[in-house]
């Protein structure tokens, strides 16, 4: 069983030079994350928007001061500059598509790289910040 959310497939980049974004399908096995142990802790992207589309299970989100749960077929959009975190809100597995610009895909890859060290520095390198 995985100890963190795992990428399942990447659809690659879509869009033109100015509006390019990446779709990546992820899964979380359930039982490992929750509000206190999120898939991604509270952070902010200063220059990039981000969105999720839930395929299976239930994800919980903190977006700014609000919390919401999203089930299959639901989408959550987080505009740049908005603090956010997310977690598997159910007991079972969750599958979702993360929609993000290439810079955020590079951030996720850097955070999951073997031997990734200073997470705060990695976030800063990608116009983002851990809170």
Model regions and ranges:
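A short glycine-rich, His/Asp/Glu-containing loop-to-beta-strand
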Residues: 2-42, 48-49
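A short, compositionally biased micro-patch
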Residues: 47, 54, 71, 79-81, ...
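Short, conserved beta-strand element in jelly-roll/cupin
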Residues: 25-27, 44-61, 99
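Double-stranded beta-helix
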Residues: 89-131
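Structural motif
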Residues: 51, 58-60, 67, 83, ...
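Short beta-strand His + acidic residue motifs that chelate non-heme Fe in jelly-roll/DSBH
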Residues: 61-62, 78, 84-90, 95-98
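Short acidic-glycine-tyrosine-enriched beta hairpin
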Residues: 19, 65-83
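Short glycine-/acidic-enriched loop or helix-start segments at secondary-structure transitions
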Residues: 63-64, 72, 87-88, 108
């Amino acid at each position: 069983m995985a100890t963190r959310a795992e990428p399942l497939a990447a659809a690659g980049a879509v869009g033109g030079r100015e509006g390019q974004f990446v779709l990546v399908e992820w899964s979380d096995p359930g039982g490992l994350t929750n509000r206190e142990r999120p898939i991604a802790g509270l952070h902010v992207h200063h220059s990039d928007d981000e969105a999720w589309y839930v395929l299976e299970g239930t994800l919980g989100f903190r977006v700014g001061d609000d919390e919401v749960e999203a089930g299959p077929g639901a989408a959550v959009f987080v505009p740049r500059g908005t603090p956010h975190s997310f977690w598997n809100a159910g007991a079972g597995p969750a599958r979702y598509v993360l929609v993000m610009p290439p810079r955020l895909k590079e951030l996720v890859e850097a955070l999951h790289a073997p031997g990734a060290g200073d997470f705060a520095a990695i976030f800063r390198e990608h116009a983002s910040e851990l809170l």
